[in-house]
């Protein structure tokens, strides 16, 4: 097991930034709300907005499992007839080395980029590329994890009428979202990853 993974167990116990309950944006800021209130708020807003397939965008983090990526893709397709689901597909390198173990180490530290590619999600190289693909008039943005966490993208997302974030940790996305639903850490899942 690599040092980066082996030594992150301490992060699993940090409770201050953990999202444990659904959060809803109110005039006073974010408040804990019940699951029922979270789902009702999302449903009411979607019924009010009546988004078309081109007005719904999804962003996923490649720390999500294959099962989560598949279900998120299915939600967008079956629920909104949208195939606008993007993941960070950044450039990475694999060093050439005479020492075998070094040839196994790449600059790609994402655990499931290959899984996202195999599920035929749309890769984006940068947040600027994502910004260019979000059309004017987008009504719903669904974000799984914290992909493309960039000030310009977060600022543009603030203009979208409904932003939903599913994440285990607080981030710029949870602060931008109208509703944030708690996600799970890798240690809390029985899931698969394709690296």
Task: Identify the residue ranges that each predicted region occupies.
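Catalytic alpha/large subunits of respiratory electron-transfer oxidoreductases
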Residues: 1-189, 194
């Amino acid at each position: 097991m690599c040092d980066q993974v082996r030594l992150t167990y301490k992060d699993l116990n940090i409770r201050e930034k953990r999202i444990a309950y659904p959060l809803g944006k109110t005039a006073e800021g974010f408040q804990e709300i019940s699951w029922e209130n979270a789902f009702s708020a999302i449903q009411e807003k979607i019924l009010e907005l009546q988004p078309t397939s081109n007005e719904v965008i999804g962003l996923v983090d490649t720390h999500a499992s294959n099962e989560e990526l598949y279900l998120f893709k299915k939600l967008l397709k079956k629920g909104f007839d949208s195939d606008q689901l993007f993941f960070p597909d950044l450039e990475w390198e694999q060093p050439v080395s005479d020492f075998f173990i070094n040839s196994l180490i790449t600059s790609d530290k994402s655990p499931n980029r290959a899984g996202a590619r195999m599920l035929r999600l749309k890769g984006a190289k940068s947040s600027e590329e994502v910004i260019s693909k979000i059309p004017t008039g987008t009504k719903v943005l669904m974000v799984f994890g914290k992909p493309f966490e960039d000030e310009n993208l977060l600022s543009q997302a603030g203009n979208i009428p409904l932003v939903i974030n599913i994440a285990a940790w607080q981030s710029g996305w949870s602060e931008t979202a109208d509703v944030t639903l708690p996600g799970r850490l890798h240690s809390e899942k029985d899931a698969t990853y394709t690296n």
